[in-house]
Amino acid sequence: MRIVALSDQHGFLPDIPPCDLLIVAGDVCPDRFGPFMAVHDPYQQQAWFDRTVRPWLAATSARHKLLTWGNHDWCGQMCSFRSDTPAHAQSTDLQILVDEGTTVASARGAGRELSVWATPWSNPFMRWAFMKRPSDLERVYAAIPAAIDILVSHQPPLYYGDRTFDLDAGRVDHVGSRELLDAIERVRPRIVICGHVHGGFGRYEHQGIPIYNVSVVDEAYRLVNAPTVIELPDV
């Protein structure tokens, strides 16, 4: 199965190469829609999503399209904007997942279905959407079922794709989630897809499990990375 994954678009809608499964791992929405619009206006975001993102998704060749939210996606948290409507699902084949799973058919219809679980949360930082304390995240991640194929999380696990530079302290910090790392060790998915930390883009590995940070923008919110293409063998 060919997977194309991206996160942290912040309003950018890059070209999507041909694939079987498209995964959007949060922060799809921009924060502001003009000089007189309030930052983090969830209803403006929802209108923008319906007007802009849905046609972009409908234009891709992906047979399956999955999305979870990120900390900039206020529409996902404030508007109860969770499951897709039948009319929109018919035109985009989109599933929006919030701490829930789904299955997708293998690329050629042979072999078993692939299981996917997606979660939008991040560690607390300033006042953003979809944030929980580590003690709460431990309970959230405990619901992830064992032996899934693909785990999608907006935030990265601790030590993998999570490095940031603290200008004030003059040091590199790891800001990923220890609780997510513990869940990965318990669940042992075939692959992990995440984002959130723009400078963490790339492929990593923990205990033989590939971890992809698929952010497409850099720390200055410039579009610098292409969507990540992952070939996952059918089983």
Task: Enumerate the predicted regions with their spans.
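Core catalytic region of metal-dependent phosphoesterases/phosphodiesterases
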Residues: 6-107
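Active-site-proximal segments of metal-dependent phosphoesterases and phosphodiesterases across multiple
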Residues: 29, 33-49, 147-188
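Extreme N-terminal starter segment of soluble prokaryotic enzymes
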Residues: 1-3
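Active-site neighborhood of phospho(di)ester-bond hydrolases with catalytic His/Asp-centered motifs
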Residues: 5-7, 22-27, 64-71, 97-99, ...
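Binuclear metal-dependent phosphoesterase catalytic core
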Residues: 102-110, 179-187, 191, 198-235
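A short secondary-structure junction signal
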Residues: 126-131, 155, 160-167, 204-205, ...
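Binuclear metal-dependent hydrolase catalytic cores centered on His/Asp/Glu-rich metal-binding motifs
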Residues: 111-150, 169-178
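Short hydrophobic patches on amphipathic alpha-helices
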Residues: 57, 141-144, 184
